[in-house]
């Protein structure tokens, strides 16, 4: 398969599974994905040991192949200014912070779009950016339960619900986010406009409750 997204630059401000899955898919399609990690510490999957490869978490290596990387402290002015400079020459920003975090840092979508009107912001959250759970953090285990996914797995109807072994809502949310970004890129090619893309672990769980 050809590198269809060659020339597309993605700033991945995401960690653990859902966001990095999306970034991984875009990188595999040829996009230049620059992973922005917090400092100190970096992506939490760096600490997912064992297994490891020469002391580096296998989970981290798996989720971040084909990506470039930079560490930024976005709580400091210098880090914010570097990020704003990067936005000027980027196409997509991918993040999975809690609702309002980017706005508190002074780099919400309104600010990004003034710097680069063609920028696409993709937000992955636990329960979406609206609704009663919008301010809550999200985790695969909880999303599998609250979406009803666990109710259709397990041994039989007389036994307790059972978690799907794989982090299914994380992975599916990454797939949904990548699909949304691809659609937004096509829309931008037609109109010249950037936009926000929003998906969630809850939405990803609902997908599997047919």
Predicted regions, residues:
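N-terminal helix-loop segment corresponding to the beta1-alpha1 unit
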Residues: 1-190
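Substrate-binding/catalytic subdomain of NAD(P)-dependent oxidoreductase enzymes
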Residues: 185-210
